[in-house]
Amino acid sequence: MAETNPELSDLMAQTNKKIVPKFTEIFPVEDVNYPYSAFIASVRKDVIKHCTDHKGIFQPVLPPEKKVPELWFYTELKTRTSSITLAIRMDNLYLVGFRTPGGVWWELARPATPTSSATTPGGSASAAGTRTSSATRVWRPSPWAARDDQGRQRPGEEEEDGDTGGGGGADADADAGGAELAAAAAAADPQADTKSKLVKLVVMVCEGLRFNTLSRTVDAGFNSQHGVTLTVTQGKQVQKWDRISKAAFEWADHPTAVIPDMQKLGIKDKNEAARIVALVKNQTTAAAAAATAASADNDDDEA
């Protein structure tokens, strides 16, 4: 029986619509004069150009989410011998695809829906921006593997099948997406310290953009042989970025509101939230959808 064609992934959809990244930020990981902190600050600055100010919220607010995102950016992590490119949605800072040193795009296939990335409290961070249930999460080679950023086939390049050289296939389980990224990073450079830096960057870039506290932690431990370890509180905050963003909108309307969920995260008010979180996820789309649903329910009751 012929296999049903899957729904277009975000990467394929943006290419079909001729949507190109708004910018590409290159990070030469071996350049001691361009530290991780400078890289994250530069990417944030470019993202903020597409953000909006919201009355009562201190942080820039990301663009509203769309089913097929139209705002993207790439970050290219380079060594002297190779590079890895990450495709990141600007409306929610989710990592949904990456290009290996061999030029193969791997993407998070639908129907998986990316949510906030997960970090084990007190442990090292896991795959950034791509947390979904093990039943739905699938990494697969993109059919657009050998195309450039404008969707054109690169001369002389063939699209690849199979894995990234890390021993894992396309149908990865909940943890294998991060393993594929790590394998790609390891292939980029044989030097152990550079491999470590690449893996940490691949894991941390999305959360590093979202969180002031996390990016400072990563920067402080960037050259550590032991990797970067988050506190229990930091891990919980990373898991609740969506909820912290929602709280920022609540505080905008009710500045003195006591929000129990935030107190559990060690965030007592909007000032504390602004110290911890650098960029807020837009809640206006969700609010509009909720209002529409409520209106429909009222209409049904009146009918």
Curated annotation (Swiss-Prot):
Keywords for this protein: Cytoplasm, Hydrolase, Plant defense, Protein synthesis inhibitor, Toxin
Q: Which PROSITE patterns match?
A: SHIGA_RICIN
Low complexity bias (residue ranges) = 112-137
Tissue spec: Endosperm.
Database matches in InterPro entries? Ribosome-inact_prot_sf, Ribosome_inactivat_1/2, Ribosome_inactivat_prot, Ribosome_inactivat_prot_CS, Ribosome_inactivat_prot_sub1, Ribosome_inactivat_prot_sub2
Name the enzyme group at the top EC level.
hydrolase
GO molecular function terms listed in the Swiss-Prot or TrEMBL record: rRNA N-glycosylase activity; toxin activity
Q: Which residues cross the membrane?
A: none
Q: What is its EC number?
A: 3.2.2.22
Chain coiled-coil ranges: none
Q: Does the keyword Cytoplasm apply?
A: yes
UniProt cross-references to Gene3D superfamilies, sorted A to Z: Ricin (A subunit), domain 1 (3.40.420.10), Ricin (A Subunit), domain 2 (4.10.470.10)
Task: Please give the GO cellular component terms listed in this UniProt entry.
Answer: cytoplasm
Listed under GO biological process in this entry are: defense response; negative regulation of translation
Region (Disordered) location: 112-175
Q: Report the subcellular localization.
A: Cytoplasm
| Reaction(s) this enzyme catalyzes, per UniProt | Endohydrolysis of the N-glycosidic bond at one specific adenosine on the 28S rRNA
Cysteine-cysteine disulfides: none
A Pfam family found in this protein is: RIP
Function, as annotated, reads: A possible regulatory factor for the synthesis of zeins, the major group of storage proteins.
Q: Whom does it interact with, and what assembly results?
A: Monomer.
Family (UniProt): Belongs to the ribosome-inactivating protein family. Type 1 RIP subfamily.
Q: What is this protein called?
A: Albumin b-32
Organism annotation: Zea mays
